[in-house]
């Protein structure tokens, strides 16, 4: 029974995309990604009574150049939706919204699995910035320092046409150094790119 269901799903999936799809062509490309990110913010980061959610709706736009079927380089801008802290410093009514954004520079090695499916990894650096500190009773909360951090991730792409791939990806910005550095982020996304050739 399970085998029949699996076969039907694979059959439907295989015909959901154009039959003549083939690998992306080398050249410049633009990429848009949407998804959710774990900002690893906690109410305790601001001694707050609560936060709305540490999971943030997130978007990323990027431009890159694919040298061949195995290597690309990418630069991107990521914007995380705000995390709202309520009762900062344990004081009711002392609220603040924290916004985070990042600029990244990534090498992107790729492994073709078939003519139109690729596994890829990303490795590089990201500049992470946060705005939204608050001073309550003389104490500064969420006064994060902007910082350069390592960034890495993995993904799977499918070429709908040679010019238009879709992808699923996970990207992490790894906070280093401790202190008042912004916590790490984990971004889970679906994306669509366009290759100019």
Give names to the regions the model predicted:
Residues 24-27, 36-42, 59-136, 158-160, ...:
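Gram-negative (and chloroplast) outer-membrane scaffold detector with strong preference
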Residues 129-176:
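A generic hydrophobic-segment detector
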Residues 13, 22, 53, 65, ...:
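Generic marker of residues within folded, mature protein domains
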Residues 45-47:
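Short, basic, glycine/proline-bearing loop/turn elements
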Residues 42-43, 176-178:
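A short, acidic/glycine-rich surface segment
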Residues 1-27, 197:
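Cleavable N-terminal export/targeting peptides
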